[in-house]
């Protein structure tokens, strides 16, 4: 008996005549109305039974099924709320993508810190689960992008004090949740005898609880999770992760009903994809030229009913499972593969296109980290599938079809992102193919396949798909074993966001201190105040002083701390840093002002004013960037400073000079308009409802009420920093430069106020210095510099030409050169004390004459070699260089036709060249 068995013995099950049974196939316990049922109903224990025989009497579209669900729960006392974005890192910092509706309410609502937007509530939340990517297309039921229809209730135990959590008491719990599920099925005309409720305890994120999988006609249509436990080393319940758990004060109904699967159930199509993407599937089939006879179509449908057996989470070998399906269908497995694999690719393309539409529509920009990396991975896999199956429709068109269906307004930006990424991918493949060839040569002739970890690194670092590696490896005699869950393994490397490090141990005195009253929010321009010293912590260097109230701003949100002084009587101490810990502000000082002393504080006013101007200017630059570049632009990081500041934004290409000028123009127009900058502290749910999650450009603040900064009517953000009162106080904003931080993230460096004037003067000084050096007017510097550059390039080309002529002359003249016969081929051994370009040119000249070239140089006090080999000659240049370089204390290598290397021992150069003929002969014989 499991520890949680009692949790599943519901009054509702007893009242409705359910029986608890154990599946003889998988061992799962389940509840059913059917006394004769033996199996749990879930694949692979049972197959899909609704294909060509829908589970509901009426066929629903996606929108119709969504409305039926939400309306049902509205009629049963739930409030409908709008869905959140698929990029969960816009309101939380511990995950990247929204994978379930409960993500919308973690961690603040689920922990009881803030109330839910409604209680109970219902929602249909778009989600993306990267771990399902390898199942998409194969199982007939998996989609990477999906909508999780859900209803939630947030409860606390009655004995808990009312003010301890943001909600109190019980709304409803397990019996009502199962009854709602049953009644929903009944309202849609389902055969209730065919529904099974499988016990499957849930564990995740340090929480746990009983959970029920709801199976109907072979398909899992819902999961009912009852989150009521937390990890506890002294807990009474051991869960499937091996940890023990105990019950919490809060308990939450967390349900998930897959919209796509419910729609599929109502239509009874061969796979979920025909139900979800009917137009896209038809378009892709026609474009790819996929047509089936009536007999082939019947075989495909028969195979579809068994496709649930291909789930990589349940089988060790997908192809072996496909072979078993072929045996059951009495068809050759190769014939089955010919029919279904093109369809599996079609299904995956449709699903991935929808996933990309969600990602780019919600503002994710492709990059090498975080959500941007995941988007890039999906796009590149989709592009590979499109090319393999021979679809000639542009990928941006396929994604746009889904973006239009989803109602996104930024479709032009979405298409441009896709086109830009395709161009980058082509360049990546050109560079990466050479890497794969070298790797394949390394493993060719060995008994070892190219390891999975190497495949993952090739994909991560070079974007090279595993099937491309397999193709190149096969050509060169190497083998590759691509795991069935390859893309899920890639996603696992990037799925988790970086969490905060564990908090340091706290002094008991510190834990007893009250939160510091922050005066700077009441008057951001004020720099003087009075306070009482509550405590002083002595450090190895300096002191941390805690006051009852402060005007000093602590470092946070990319804004440096204020500095200044504290004065107690005749004693004045310098405040050199300010930090905040759990609401307590710590003033780092160079001396002890005395615990219990009354102090006067003086903030450095010039520093504060410059930081205020730069912080508000950061908001202006961000707003201007969205105006100029598009609404997909979001903050990726920021740092305010005294002389300049920077704003990192997510954008898919380099910012042009014209765009920089337009960003400056928009920002300075707001400065000239002198609009008010005001703050407010609204309820979090109300703020999110009114302004959306673009509020959180600089991170997600804690608390039920959050501070919003409004810049006129143009921009609103959650922000804890100090700001000017009106934009006119900034004076001016000047963009100093832009640069790529990483792929998909652009940095805008700018200055505001007096710092902008100083930066402009520094630029002008540099221009005037250049004008004096060139002896021209400052306005003529660009033209003069360009002329000088062209002349310099011309002379460089002349020098290169002369070097080539000299190399040819040396090659033909035989200066310091020895010719030897190596297996019927002439090899030239030559010493030439020139630079690397001269060595390469001379070697190339010999190779052009059909000769093996070994050219050495002792210039600059070291030895270097270049080896060139003509086509068709069985000598490996890389091995020759490696042997020779070792004789001068170094190393080197390269491809078989051209290699270079060297070492520090120039005195050994001649001996190495003398040995070159023997080296060539030994390697040729080997």
UniProtKB/Swiss-Prot annotation:
Top-rank taxon, per record: Archaea
InterPro entries, A to Z: aa-tRNA-synth_II/BPL/LPL, Ala-tRNA-lgiase_IIc, Ala-tRNA-ligase_IIc_anticod-bd, Ala-tRNA-synth_IIc_core, Ala-tRNA-synth_IIc_N, Ala-tRNA_lgiase_arc, Ala-tRNA_ligase, DHHA1_dom
Main location: cytoplasm
Entry cofactors: Zn(2+)
Top EC class, one word: ligase
Free-text cofactor note: Binds 1 zinc ion per subunit.
Transmembrane segments: none
Gene Ontology cellular-component annotations: cytoplasm
Matches recorded under PROSITE patterns: AA_TRNA_LIGASE_II_ALA (PS50860)
Keyword set includes Lipid metabolism: no
The protein's name: Alanine--tRNA ligase
């Amino acid at each position: 008996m499991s520890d949680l068995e009692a949790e599943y013995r519901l009054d509702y099950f007893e009242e409705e005549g359910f029986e608890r049974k154990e599946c003889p196939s998988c061992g799962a316990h389940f509840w059913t109305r059917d006394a004769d049922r033996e199996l749990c109903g879930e694949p692979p224990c049972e197959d899909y039974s609704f294909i060509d025989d829908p589970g509901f009497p009426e066929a629903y579209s996606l929108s119709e099924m969504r409305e039926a669900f939400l309306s049902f729960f509205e009629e049963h006392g739930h409030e409908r709320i709008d869905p959140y974005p698929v990029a969960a890192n816009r309101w939380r910092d511990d995950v990247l993508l929204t994978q379930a509706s409960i993500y919308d309410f973690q961690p603040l609502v689920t922990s009881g810190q803030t109330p839910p937007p409604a209680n109970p509530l219902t929602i249909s939340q778009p989600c993306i689960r990267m771990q399902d990517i390898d199942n998409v297309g194969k199982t007939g039921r998996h989609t990477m992008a999906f909508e999780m229809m859900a209803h939630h209730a947030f409860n606390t135990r009655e004995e808990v004090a009312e003010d301890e959590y943001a909600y109190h008491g019980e709304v409803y719990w397990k019996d009502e949740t199962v009854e709602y599920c049953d009644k929903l099925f009944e309202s849609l005309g389902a055969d209730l005898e065919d529904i099974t409720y499988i016990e499957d305890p849930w564990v995740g994120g340090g929480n746990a609880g009983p959970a029920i999988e709801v199976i109907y006609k072979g398909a899992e249509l819902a999961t009912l999770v009852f989150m009521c436990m937390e990890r506890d080393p002294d807990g009474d319940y051991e869960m499937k992760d091996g940890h023990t758990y105990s019950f919490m004060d809060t308990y939450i109904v967390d349900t998930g009903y897959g919209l796509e699967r419910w729609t599929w159930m109502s239509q009874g199509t061969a796979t979920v994809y025909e139900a979800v993407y009917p137009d896209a599937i038809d378009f892709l089939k026609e474009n790819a030229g996929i047509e089936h006879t009536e007999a082939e179509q019947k075989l495909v449908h028969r195979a579809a009913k068994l496709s649930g057996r291909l789930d990589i989470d349940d089988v060790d070998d997908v192809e072996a499972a496909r072979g078993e399906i072929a045996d059951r269908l009495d068809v050759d497995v190769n014939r089955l593969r010919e029919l279904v694999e093109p369809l599996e690719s079609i299904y995956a393309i449709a699903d991935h296109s929808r996933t990309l539409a969600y990602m780019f529509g919600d503002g994710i920009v492709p990059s090498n980290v975080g959500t941007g990396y995941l988007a890039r991975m999906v796009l590149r896999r989709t592009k590979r599938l499109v090319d393999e199956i021979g679809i000639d429709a542009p990928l941006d068109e396929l994604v746009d079809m889904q973006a239009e269906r989803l109602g996104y307004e930024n479709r032009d930006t979405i298409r441009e992102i896709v086109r830009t990424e395709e161009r980058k991918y082509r360049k990546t493949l050109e560079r990466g193919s050479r890497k794969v060839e070298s790797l394949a040569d390394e493993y060719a002739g060995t008994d070892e396949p190219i390891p999975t970890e190497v495949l993952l690194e090739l994909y991560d670092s070079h974007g090279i798909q595993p099937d491309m590696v397999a193709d190149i490896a096969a050509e060169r005699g190497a083998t590759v074993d691509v795991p069935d869950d390859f893309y899920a393994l890639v996603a696992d490397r990037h799925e988790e966001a970086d969490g905060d490090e564990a908090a340091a141990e706290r002094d008991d005195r510190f834990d007893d201190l009250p939160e510091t009253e922050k005066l700077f929010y009441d008057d951001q321009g004020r720099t003087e105040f009075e306070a009482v010293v509550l405590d002083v912590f002595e450090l190895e260097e300096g002191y941390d002083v805690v006051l009852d109230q402060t005007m000093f701003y602590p470092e946070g949100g990319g804004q440096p701390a204020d500095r200044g002084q504290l004065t107690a009587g005749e004693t004045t101490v310098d405040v050199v840093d300010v930090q905040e810990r759990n609401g307590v502000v710590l003033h780092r000082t160079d001396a002890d002002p005395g615990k219990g002393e009354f102090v006067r504080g003086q903030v450095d006013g010039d520093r504060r004013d410059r930081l205020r101007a730069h912080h508000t200017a950061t908001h202006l630059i961000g707003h201007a960037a969205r105006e100029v570049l598009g609404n997909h632009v979001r903050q990726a990081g920021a740092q305010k400073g005294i002389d300049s500041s920077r704003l990192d934004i997510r954008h898919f290409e380099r910012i042009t000079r014209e765009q920089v000028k337009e960003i400056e123009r928009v920002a300075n127009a707001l400065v000239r308009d002198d609009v008010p900058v005001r703050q407010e502290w609204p309820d979090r749910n109300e703020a999110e409802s009114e302004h959306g999650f673009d509020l959180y450009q600089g991170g997600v603040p804690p608390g039920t009420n959050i501070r919003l900064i409004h810049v006129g009517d143009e921009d609103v953000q959650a922000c804890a920093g100090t700001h000017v009162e009106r934009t006119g106080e900034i004076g001016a904003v000047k963009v100093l430069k832009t640069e790529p931080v990483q792929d998909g993230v652009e940095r805008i460096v700018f200055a505001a106020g007096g710092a902008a004037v100083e930066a402009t003067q520094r630029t002008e000084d540099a221009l005037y210095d250049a004008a004096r050096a060139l002896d021209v007017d400052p306005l003529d510097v660009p033209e003069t510099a360009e002329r000088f550059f062209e002349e310099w390039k011309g002379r460089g080309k002349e020098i290169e030409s002369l070097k080539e002529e000299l190399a040819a002359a040396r090659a033909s003249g035989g200066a310091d050169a020895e010719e030897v016969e190596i297996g019927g081929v002439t090899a030239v051994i030559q010493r030439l004390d020139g630079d690397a370009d001269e060595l390469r040119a001379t070697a190339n000249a010999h190779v052009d004459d059909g000769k093996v070239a070994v050219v050495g140089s002792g210039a600059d006090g070291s030895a270097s070699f270049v080896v060139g080999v003509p086509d068709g000659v069985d000598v490996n240049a890389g091995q020759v260089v490696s042997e020779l370089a070792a004789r001068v204390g170094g190393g080197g290598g390269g491809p078989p036709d051209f290699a270079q290397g060297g070492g520090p021992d120039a005195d050994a150069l001649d001996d190495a060249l003398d040995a070159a003929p023997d080296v060539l002969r030994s390697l040729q014989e080997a």
